[in-house]
Amino acid sequence: MTLGASRGRPIILYVVTEDWYFLQHRLPMARAAARAGYKVHLATRVNKDRRTIEDFGFALHPLNWRRGSLNPLDIVSIVAEIRQLYRLLQPDIVHHVALQPVVIGSLASIGMPLAQLNSFCGLGFASPQLKTRMVGAALKALLPRLTNRPRTIATVENKDDKAVLSAIGLRPDRIFVLPGSGVDIQRLAPLAEPQGAITAAFAGRLLVNKGVRTLIAAHDLLSKRGVQLRLLIAGGPDLANPTSIPMAEIESWKRRPGITVMGHVSDIADVWKLAHFGILPSRGGEGLPMSLLEAAACGRPLVATDVPGCREIARPGINAMLVPVDDPSALAEAISRMASDRELRRQFGQASRRIVEAEYSSEIVGREVVVLYDRLADRHPDASPENRP
């Protein structure tokens, strides 16, 4: 007998590449689903977070997932593994989180009458900077065939990504804008400005696509001009990502005056306690950057690049300054202005917090995603989130 044959509450199965990613980016969403009466299951590669996940009451299904691998044997293996889980569990809803699970999970479900929610957390395949453009072209051809199925909807994290997916053939009436899981505004409260030297912070994985090299170059320009700025870099490399910064280069940053490489930080509030403003010079492919959301929740003004995702939360003249991609000079100028104007930082920081409270709290986003789950589970088949396009 399958697990699904003797269930009480409807089962929702999250398919995610890594356990840490689920905890960082989808935990509030899963907890909202549990509060709404769903039994939460998670299929993922388990690193060190099994106990934490199970303590939340979620059923865990370990996967032998090799994130980022394009080896056909690896792909066939993980598709078969997930398909077997679908057959055993018979979930009421499958929620594929991020591009690789969307593709792999959709392949695994071919021929199965599963209700599916496909969450696109940024569209790296649509970027001209993608290293392997053939992969991007193949995905653009494949995605409409995989995702335009009955009882299947998609979410994106910004309006630009909705337009891209619609342009390649996904049905626009089945694409909803949903900003990840939002941010916990109780845990991340507004912080007073720190005392001492003006400090800017970058928080995130150390990837080329995050624009960290541009940030280092901008800091060099400021140093040459005599601008005293302390730069914190919180985060580490991601060895499974082809754009990860080499360790030798990261080590070289530690030797530069005015730069502190903090590595992974367990409590992100510890970063924003030390920083006067947040920076993300992304090169594109973002959904809605969690680092900017968290900085804004803590009442920090923002400096970011003018790319989809960043400009959703970093709003020029309101709470942020936006600069062109790969432009160290423009970035240095924005950093210098933010560093020199305390009143501007105060106004922008207050606006950041207001934006998060009004639009991006995990409570608001949790209610919105439950509406989509209920629609897929036929609890409310015509429902859709009301406050986002």
Regions found by a protein language model. Give the residues of each.
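Donor nucleotide-sugar binding/catalytic pocket of nucleotide-sugar-dependent glycosyltransferases
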Residues: 61-62, 140-190, 202
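Conserved donor-binding/catalytic core segment of Leloir-type glycosyltransferases
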Residues: 192-210, 215-219, 231-232
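Conserved acidic donor-binding segment of nucleotide-sugar-dependent glycosyltransferases
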Residues: 315-317, 321-328, 337-343
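Short hydrophobic beta-strand element within catalytic cores of glycosyltransferases
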Residues: 280, 301-304, 314
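A short, well-ordered alpha-helix in the C-terminal region of glycosyltransferases
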Residues: 330, 337, 344-359, 365-371
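Glycosyltransferase donor-sugar binding loop
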Residues: 44-48, 203, 230-245
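Nucleotide-activated donor-binding/catalytic signature segment of Leloir-type glycosyltransferases, i.e.
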Residues: 235, 244-265
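Acidic anion/phosphate-binding donor-loop and adjacent secondary structure
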Residues: 70-74, 166-167, 172-174, 179-198, ...
